[in-house]
């Protein structure tokens, strides 16, 4: 099989079973693609540790440790989160820039036999596309800011 690189704007979300964000929990918490689930390949602590080694010591040593931790974490996700997925499961995977973390996860899923795709450019690309769309189309939308205390029938007004 082959891992597909897909530009987010070209994706038919209705055909996907899951959108998987493999970034760390804190990155996911800040923001993520709507509907995505977080299956991090590195914890926040692991990501920080590898980043420190990468910058202060050796890129090679950081990559070796990263590969070890990522392999362990992907193995855990296979056992705990996705082992029940059938052969026809269609996941879309992304990380920050569509690089090493998403491809590590995608490569293993691909080797198992799932038809997997990676967001080209990762979450950063998705965010840029959303921003460009809004900047080009803002005049087509009418925004209303609705405020008020609890119990003042805001929900009734919206409905």
Briefly describe each language-model feature range.
Residues 142-159:
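Glycine-rich phosphate-binding P-loop
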Residues 79-84, 128-137:
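A short, basic/flexible loop-to-alpha-helix module at the beginning of a structural domain
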Residues 13-86:
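Positively charged, proline/Ser/Thr-rich regional signature most characteristic
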Residues 1-11, 16-17:
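N-terminal extension/subdomain marker
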Residues 88-89, 140-144:
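Pre-Walker A (Motif I) flank of P-loop NTPase domains
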